[in-house]
Amino acid sequence: MAQFDVLKNPGQQQEAIPFVVVLQNARFDRSTTRFVAPLVLSRLANIVEHYLAPRFIIHGVEVVMDVFNLATLPVNRMGTPVASLADEESRVKLMRALDDFLSQA
């Protein structure tokens, strides 16, 4: 699966977190896990800083990225991608949120 692919959440909180987005660079595809961010239903998200929680519409569902709950998932638990956030606008929003979250400033 490619960086910025969106997959159905294989975890237990699928109602609140219907999707995850793969953040890991393809250079590390040999790994048995993928670094992902949960995509939480926007109406349930506790957004502290809006720039840290970019909004997306996935199959008609409004979600926000939750940078405070980044995780790794085993590849064998992940299904087929259902969407992609690899377009330039989405990539910029994702990377800006991650950069701000991880910045040393």
Could you tell me what each predicted segment is?
Residues 1-5, 43, 85, 98-99:
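Short N-terminal helix-initiation segments at or just after the protein's N-terminus
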Residues 3-6, 10, 14-55:
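Compact nucleic-acid interaction/catalytic patches
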Residues 56-105:
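C-terminal terminal-subdomain/extension
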